[in-house]
């Protein structure tokens, strides 16, 4: 009894300690988020203030009207950036609180992805965009494990339960980054499909956004395909062939305000919150999102969303019984 009590007490203390660590980590992240948000909001505010002061200083000088137009253009640009930033911050705050999302709608995912591909083509007419199917390429050895691969063909019609506007936001954010940070004539492959995986949505959504998790997912898909068990998942991949992101920084792109080049991100109109919002939305759907390298260079973003449980295969005995019953009825 004493030994059992000691084990229970140690277990309870371990859980309390883990809870304290988790709370401290959450508090630290919140402090960092507030600090980063304050810094990001200060930048456009400082620009607005600076150009307003410049206008006041120059309004009585010769050529003041032309310079005033220039100042107003800068003020408008900074104001627009601040508006986008505030909207993204509010969006994240609502998602953190579990508000602003309704995952009970029927979402035509294929239409959402096709619309995004059309939008990207309109933005970059010289860019080659291929849409196709997603499949698993079997591994050859330990150094070359199984992985996702692109196959030519029509994207399948996929409908799932979720929040249509939020999932559209995820896809739009990904395509927006491709437009901003890759050459306008570099090719893009967009593939999608439904694959079974022997992993629950709850476990999937808790996996860290790294390539080890991707390998774990591919293994779960191979088991799901061979055993016909688990959950069917809609998988969408966006592969660009731009400058890419170093392997050690790929998981960081989902951190709030993370940008590989902050000055370039501001020039391109990015807030550093797009991928953080995408991850929050995907996790709210009990899904998974991850960044990895594209074959031949570039960045690939993979979005995985649950569709429905896999229909189990009938047991051989059950099939035999059904056949026997059918035969008896026929004889009668």
Predicted regions and their residues:
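Membrane-proximal coiled-coil signaling linkers
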Residues: 14-59, 71
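Short alpha-helical segment of the dimerization/phosphotransfer core of two-component systems
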Residues: 21, 77-82
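Conserved micro-motifs of the catalytic ATP-binding
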Residues: 97-103, 142, 155-162
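Short helix N-cap motif at coil->helix boundaries in the Bergerat
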Residues: 109, 244-255
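Short helix-loop "hinge" at the ATP-lid/N-box region of the Bergerat-fold HATPase_c
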Residues: 178-179
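Short beta-strand/loop element within the Bergerat-fold HATPase_c
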Residues: 185-199, 222-231
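Glycine-rich ATP-binding loops of the HATPase_c
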Residues: 286-292
